C-alpha cells in the first residue's frame, strides 16, 4: 500500500510538469506577405501551452528602445498564419515601442499539435494565455503591461481570453467574428434549430466515417476564382487569401485546403462570449462600416458594455472599410493605426 501511494505521488509530480517542446521545423527566410521593417528586430520563438502543444511565433522588438517594454500577443485571422495579417499588426506595433509576438495557433502553420487544421475555442483561448505566460517571463517585458490583439475569429477569441485572464491589461479586437454564433446560427442568423440539428447529424456521421477510414478530411478551402453567384464577402476573402500580391501563403489553411470538416462541431454547443460583461480591462473593437461581419462587432460592444465595466470599452467603425480591408489595409489603407496605438498606449501606460 505504501509503495502504491509513493508511486501515485511520483506519477502526479511527473504529470504536473510542462510538456517538452515539440520539434518544429521553422523557416529562416523572410516569407511574410508584407515588407520587412528596418525599424525592428525579428526572430522566431516557441513556447508550450497547457495542452502540451508547442506554438511557433515571430517576435518583433523595436531597435531603438531598451529596458522593459510593454508587450502584445497577436493572432488571426481565423485560419490564417503569422506571416499574414497578425504579423503585419505585430511588426507595426513594434515600430511604436512594443515587444510583440504573432503566433500560429495550435494545429496550424508552424505550430505543433495533431491532427492538423483543427480548431477548438478552449485550446485557442489557451493559446492566447500561453502567449501571455511567455511574455510575462521575458526579462525585457514589463509583465504589468501586456495586451492582446485578435483579428477576425481571433478577435472573438481575444474577448474570451480577456474575460478569463486578468494579466491581459488591454484587448484590441479587429474585424471580429463570434465563431460560436456564426457556427450555430449561420451568417446573418439564417440557421434555425432544425438546421443546427441537421448540421450536427452530418458532422457526427462524418466523424464515424473518418474513424472507420483512419483519415481526417479537409473542407476543401476557398475556390481560386469566385462563381457568378458568390456573395460579396466571399469574393473579398478570395481576393485576399488567394492573391500572391496580397495575402496568399503556402502554410495558410485559408489559402489552401481549409479546416477539417468536423472542426466546427464542438462550437455548436458553446457560448464564446458568456463572460464578456465581466471584462474589466480596456477593450477596443474595430470594425469596417461595410463589413459583412459588422454585426459581430456591435454584438461584442453591447455585451462588453452591458455590465458595470462599460466605461473603458470603445467601438470604432472605420468608414467605407470592408471585413478584409482591416486585414492588410486594402486599397484605402483602412487600418486605423493611430487610433489603435493611442488606445493601447493609454490603456497600459
Feature annotation, model-predicted:
Residues 20-67:
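N-terminal cap/lid segment of alpha/beta-hydrolase-fold proteins
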Residues 67-77:
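Short beta-strand element of the alpha/beta-hydrolase
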Residues 79-91, 105, 297:
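The serine-hydrolase catalytic nucleophile loop
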Residues 92-112:
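Conserved alpha/beta-hydrolase
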Residues 118-139:
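Alpha/beta-hydrolase active-site loop
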Residues 159-243:
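Alpha/beta-hydrolase-fold enzymes
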Residues 279, 285-287:
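Short beta-strand/loop motif that positions the catalytic acidic residue
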Residues 321-333:
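Catalytic histidine-centered segment of alpha/beta-hydrolase-like enzymes
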Amino acid at each position: 500500500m505504501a509503495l502504491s501511494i509513493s508511486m501515485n505521488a511520483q506519477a502526479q509530480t511527473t504529470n504536473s510538469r510542462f510538456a517538452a517542446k515539440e520539434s518544429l521545423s521553422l523557416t529562416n527566410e523572410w516569407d511574410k506577405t508584407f515588407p520587412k521593417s528596418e525599424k525592428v528586430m525579428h526572430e522566431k520563438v516557441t513556447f508550450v501551452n497547457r495542452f502540451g502543444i508547442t506554438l511557433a511565433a515571430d517576435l518583433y522588438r523595436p531597435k531603438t528602445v531598451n529596458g522593459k517594454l510593454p508587450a502584445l500577443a497577436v493572432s488571426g485571422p481565423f485560419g490564417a498564419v503569422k506571416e499574414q495579417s497578425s504579423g503585419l499588426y505585430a511588426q507595426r506595433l513594434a515600430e511604436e515601442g512594443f515587444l510583440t509576438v504573432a503566433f500560429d495557433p495550435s494545429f496550424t502553420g508552424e505550430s505543433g499539435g495533431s491532427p492538423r487544421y483543427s480548431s477548438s475555442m478552449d485550446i485557442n483561448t489557451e493559446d492566447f494565455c500561453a502567449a501571455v505566460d511567455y511574455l510575462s517571463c521575458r526579462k525585457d517585458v514589463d509583465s504589468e503591461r501586456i495586451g492582446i490583439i485578435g483579428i477576425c475569429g481571433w478577435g472573438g477569441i481575444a474577448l474570451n481570453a480577456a474575460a478569463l485572464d486578468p494579466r491581459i491589461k488591454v484587448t484590441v479586437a479587429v474585424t471580429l467574428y463570434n465563431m460560436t454564433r456564426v457556427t450555430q446560427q449561420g451568417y446573418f442568423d439564417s440557421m434555425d434549430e432544425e438546421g443546427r440539428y441537421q448540421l450536427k447529424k452530418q458532422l457526427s456521421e462524418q466523424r464515424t466515417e473518418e474513424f472507420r477510414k483512419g483519415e481526417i478530411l479537409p473542407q476543401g478551402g476557398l475556390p481560386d476564382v469566385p462563381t457568378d453567384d458568390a456573395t460579396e464577402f466571399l469574393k473579398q476573402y478570395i481576393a485576399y487569401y488567394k492573391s500572391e500580391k496580397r495575402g496568399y501563403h503556402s502554410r495558410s489553411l485559408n489559402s489552401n485546403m481549409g479546416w477539417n470538416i468536423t472542426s466546427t462541431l464542438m462550437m455548436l454547443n458553446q457560448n464564446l462570449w458568456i463572460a464578456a460583461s465581466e471584462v474589466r480591462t480596456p477593450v477596443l473593437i474595430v470594425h469596417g462600416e461595410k463589413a459583412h461581419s459588422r454585426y459581430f462587432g456591435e454584438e461584442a460592444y453591447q455585451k462588453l458594455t452591458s455590465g458595470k465595466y462599460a466605461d473603458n470599452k470603445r467601438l470604432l467603425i472605420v468608414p467605407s472599410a470592408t471585413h478584409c480591408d482591416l486585414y492588410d489595409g486594402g486599397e484605402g489603407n483602412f487600418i486605423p493605426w493611430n487610433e489603435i496605438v493611442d488606445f493601447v498606449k493609454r490603456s497600459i501606460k
